[in-house]
A protein has these predicted regions:
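Hydrophobic alpha-helical connector segments
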Residues: 54, 58, 68-95
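Amphipathic alpha-helical packing segments from all-alpha helical-bundle domains
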Residues: 64, 80, 108-140, 162-165
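Amphipathic alpha-helical interface segments
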Residues: 12, 16, 88, 92, ...
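Short, structured helix-loop boundary elements
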Residues: 6-7, 27, 49, 53, ...
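Helix-turn-helix
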Residues: 4, 8, 12, 16-50, ...
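Short secondary-structure transition hinges
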Residues: 87-127, 154
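Hydrophobic alpha-helical segments that form the core
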Residues: 130-157, 162-174
Length: 175
């Protein structure tokens, strides 16, 4: 077996969480599946909460990579760029929900319970909204206005008829 690393531990934890859920996954489960003692995990993580937090952050970074890497095309207005970026944000979250609903719900439920993770993610989104739009000190308001389209609480509604039209209505009101 390869040398034990944070990445190997996270991969195994994710596999077990997928099967058992977060509440039922223990460090003993993870260690046992890696053929190490649970004490070996403490060389990489302070505790189960630390491991799960790192796992949730990894998932959030992976699923948000395209959103934060987005750059506007040359010649496009800041308003059009913001519209396109917000639509990408909405559709990225929607696609993740459709692709692997179980993991989406597991991770987002976990993240939503951690105020610091939520605060940091929303701040990062707000910063990107300001960068894209050029609207200084308006990022939080922009992200809040479009909360229906990216907050996991509303995920079950993202497939309803009129979703795109509602997005455009909110956009017109904010524009």
């Amino acid at each position: 077996m390869a040398r034990l690393s944070q990445e190997i531990i996270l991969d195994m934890a994710e596999k077990i969480i997928y099967e058992k859920g977060m509440e039922k996954t223990t460090l003993y489960d993870i260690a046992g599946n890696l053929n190490v003692t649970h004490a070996a995990l403490y060389k990489h993580y302070r505790n189960k909460e630390d491991l799960f937090q790192k796992l949730a952050l990894r998932w959030l970074e992976e699923t948000s990579r395209e959103i934060f890497a987005w750059t506007q095309e040359a010649g496009i207005s800041p308003d059009d760029a913001l519209h396109d970026w917000l639509w990408l944000l909405a559709n990225t979250k929607k696609k993740r929900y459709k692709t692997d609903r179980k993991m989406f719900l597991l991770y987002t439920d976990y993240i939503e319970q951690n105020e610091e993770l939520v605060k940091n993610h929303v701040a990062h989104l707000a910063q990107k909204a300001e960068e894209v739009s050029g609207r200084t000190n308006q990022g939080n308001a922009i992200i809040t206005a479009f909360i229906y389209f990216h907050n996991p609480y509303f995920a079950s509604r993202w497939e309803q008829a009129g979703y795109a039209e509602l997005f455009e209505d909110v956009w017109q009101m904010m524009k």
